Structures are given as structure tokens and as C-alpha cells.
Regions:
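Positively charged, low-complexity terminal tracts
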Residues: 1-157
């Protein structure tokens, strides 16, 4: 396996940003023939408001929400994107139960809702902090393709 990490896919919008990073399968231990399953990390950040002097938006990555997408989560998202793009898909994680849970641990909810030609990715921690990023059709097609291809790398196939 290559030690290089794939390039993250990022969507920047006025309300916030969404970043997907593939973490491929890796060896369980040194010299082990077995692999540890990978994942896709979803990070979302709010916009800090007004653009800087050069017109670039600034995002609050220090207060981002991180959501680890397992192969099952990715399967749920792909099934929604391919077969049920009306309504919403909801994924819930309780990160406080994870070993070594950090300060940002708690109930995390990911909702992906669709309208005619756009999708809204909403990520929240409990009910206290929520980030919403709209995603257009072109971006959603790329997300679907990357997640579909990413499944094979998560399993190391």
C-alpha cells in the first residue's frame, strides 16, 4: 500500500465547507498480512462570515465537526444517492462511547436532505452546534463517485 494520502474533496459555500478525506485500509500490525478497515472522514466547518481583503472566504476549521464514515455509513449514503434521492438519510454516532473519546465527543447526527437539484448536508453535535452546507448536482455526482471508489480502498481490495 502506498504511504501517500489521497487528496481530500472539499466543497466551499457561503454558509460553510465540507471536506471528505479517504483513509484507506492499512496493515493491522507491522509485517501483518491482515489489514485494518479504513474509512472516510467527513469534516464540516462554518464560514466565519465576510471574506478577507482578497475576497476569500474564511472557515472556522478550529471548531469543525468530524464524522467518521464507516463502510456501512457509506453504503447507506450511496443507497440514498442512487435509489432514494427524495427525502433524507440520517446517520447517528455516539462518539462518547469510543475509546479515547476527546472533548468533542457526544451524539453526532448527519442528515442529508434533497430538493430538486440540490442537497443539504447537515452535521450536528447534540443539539448545541450545527453546520449546514448546500451541495449542487455536480458536487453530489463527484461525492457519489468518490465514495463508490473509496469502498474498495477502505477494504484494501
Amino acid at each position: 500500500m502506498s504511504a501517500r494520502r489521497p487528496i481530500p474533496f472539499v466543497v466551499y459555500k457561503g454558509s460553510g465547507a465540507l471536506r471528505l478525506q479517504l483513509l484507506p485500509a492499512e496493515p493491522k500490525e507491522e509485517n501483518s498480512p491482515y489489514l485494518k478497515e479504513g474509512c472516510v472522514m467527513l469534516e464540516m466547518s462554518k464560514s466565519k462570515g465576510e471574506p478577507d481583503a482578497r475576497g476569500n472566504r474564511i472557515y472556522d476549521w478550529d471548531n469543525k465537526i468530524i464524522f467518521k464514515l464507516s463502510s456501512k455509513d457509506i453504503g447507506d449514503l450511496l443507497a440514498y444517492m442512487k435509489f432514494g434521492a427524495k427525502g433524507e438519510v440520517k446517520l447517528v454516532h455516539d462518539s462518547s462511547k469510543a475509546p479515547g473519546a476527546g472533548d468533542d465527543a457526544g451524539m453526532k447526527n448527519l442528515f442529508v436532505n434533497s430538493t430538486e437539484k440540490s442537497w443539504f448536508w447537515n452535521l450536528s453535535i447534540s443539539k448545541e452546534y450545527r453546520i449546514s452546507v448546500p451541495v449542487d448536482l455536480s458536487e453530489m455526482v463527484r461525492i457519489q463517485q468518490l465514495l463508490s471508489e473509496g469502498i474498495t480502498k477502505i477494504y484494501g481490495w
